[in-house]
Amino acid sequence: MSMDFSRRDMLIGSAALGAVAAGAAHVAYAKEEPLDAAAPDVDPVETYECDFVVAGSGTAGLCAAIRAAELGMSTILVDVNTENGIGGNSRSAENCGEVPEGGADELYRNLVDYHRFASNAIVTRRFADDAQKVIDWTRDNQGVVFKEGRLKYEEDGNGTNGGKTAIYTMYNYALELGVQFLFDERAYKVLVNDEGRVTGVKCRNRVGEVIQVNAKAVDLCTGGYGCNKEMFERFTNVSYDRVINRGGMGTQMGDGITMGEELGALLFHPEAINYCSPILPGHYNKGALTICGVNQADTCFFNESGRRFCDEEVISDWTTSGNICSQQHQIYMIVDQDFVQKIMDEGVVTKRHNYFEVGEPVPQFQDEIDAALVRENPRVYKADTIEELCANVDIDVETTIAEIEKFNGYVDAGFDADFMKDPQYLRKIQTPPFYLFRSQLAFYNNVGGLRVDEFARVIGSDYKPIVGLYAGGSDAGGLFGPYYDVSIAPGSTQLWGRVSGYWAAEHAASELIPSLEA
C-alpha cells in the first residue's frame, strides 16, 4: 500500500497513527535494544511518499520538520516514541543557548578557542553567524517563549517544565504546518539507490511491522547514543556502570549514528559527552543535599583508594569535573559539621546554575542530610570519627586519614601543594560529626556523532556529502571538539539542535527539491 503525502492534501492529525496501529498508544517510550544490522529485512506493510523525512522528534528533528514545511516541502517525522514521549531528551532542557554581547564574532572566537580548533571551524563559523537568526525564528515563528533576561525556556504556568513546554509548542506549530507524525516507528535503515543517493527510510514498530517512507532527503535526529551501553563504552572508554544517564528516555540508542555508519559515514568526536555534576542517585538533584553536599569547591573529593584526586574547584565546570571524575571508580565527598553549619549560615561558594546563590544561607541543609541518613538507599553517612565513617563504604581507610591530615596541613599553610586549589576554598575537615557523600558522575548525552558540514550534510568516507542525508543534534558532530563547552556557551547543545535542523531543511529545499516554487 502506498500513501502519497503532499502539501496539496495535508494529512494533518495523524499524529498517533503508528502508535495506534501497533496497539501501543499508551506507551510514551521504552527501553530499546541497539539496532541489529544483521536482522532480516522485511517488506513494508505500508509505504509513504514525501519530500523530506525526519527521524526523531527532539529539538533538532522538530526544527528540521518545521522549517521544511515552512519552505513548502511535504514532510513526515517518524519517531520511536509514542506521542506522549515526543521530544526525547529535549523535554528536560532548560536553556536554548544565546549569543554574547559581542555578537557572532565573539561567539565564534569563544568556541574555537575553547575547543582549540578540535571542532570544525567552518561549521562553527556558520553556527555563530546563524545563531541569532535561528533564535529569533524560534521565538517569532515557532512561538517558543523564553524567560526574561536569559534564553531559558519558560514554563507553561501549570508546572510543566520549560523544555517540555517548548516541545509541545513546536509540535503544535508543526501540525498546523501540515507535518505528518508517525509515532512508534523506529527508523532502522536509510535507503539508497544504485547511485548512492538517499531515497528514504524503513521503520519498524514494537510489534515488528515495517513501513517505508520514500523521500528526497532524510534527516537523522534520533537523539544520540546516551542509552546505549556498548556504544558509550566504545567511544568514551568509560564504564557505563560508573555513570548515570540523566537525559535518556531509554530510546537514545545511537540509531542515527548506526544508520549513518552503515552507509560509510565518517564520525566526528563521537567520544564527546555532555557531562554534568556528580549527583546522589535517588535524591533530588536540585536540592540542598546534592548542590551543597557534592558540588562545592570548599569540600574534598576522594576516590576508592582514599586519595584526594583534584582541585575541587573543577566542580564549577561540567566538562572539567566530568573529565576528572570519569577517571575514578568511586567519588566520595567528606565534610565535617563546621562545613554543614557554614552552608546553613553563609551559603555556598559554588553556584550551580539557578539553584542557590553564592552567600545565600541554606538553612535546610542539615534537615536534608538527616532525612537522607534514614533512606533505604544510603548515599550519605555520618560518624564521629573518620575511621567509622569510612567503614560504611569501599574506601581505603588509612590512606583517607593520611590524605585528610595532609590536606589540613595545607589549610594551615594556606597553600594546596598537591593541586593548588585557590586558598579561599581551603577548609579543614576536623570537627565531628563527619559526613561522607557517595556520589556518582552523571551525563546528559553525547555531543559528537556523524560528521556533518555547514549545511548539516552527512560526510562519507570519501569526504564528500552523502547526497540526501543530513544529521542534527546529538546525531551530528561538528560544533564540538571532544568536550561540551557549557562554561562559555551554556545551552549550546539545544541551539546546535535548532541550527542543525534549520540548516538541513534549508539545504534540502534549495538543492534537492527544485520543484519548489521560489
Regions found by a protein language model. Name each.
Residues M1-L17:
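N-terminal secretory signal peptides and thylakoid transit peptides that target proteins
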Residues D130-I211, K216, N228-F232, P278-P281, ...:
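Conserved redox-cofactor binding core of oxidoreductases
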Residues D41, V80-Q180, D184-K189, F301, ...:
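Conserved N-terminal/central alpha/beta ligand/cofactor-binding core
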Residues E209, N214-L280, P490, Q494-W503, ...:
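Glycine-rich loop(s) and the adjacent beta-strand/alpha-helix scaffold that form part
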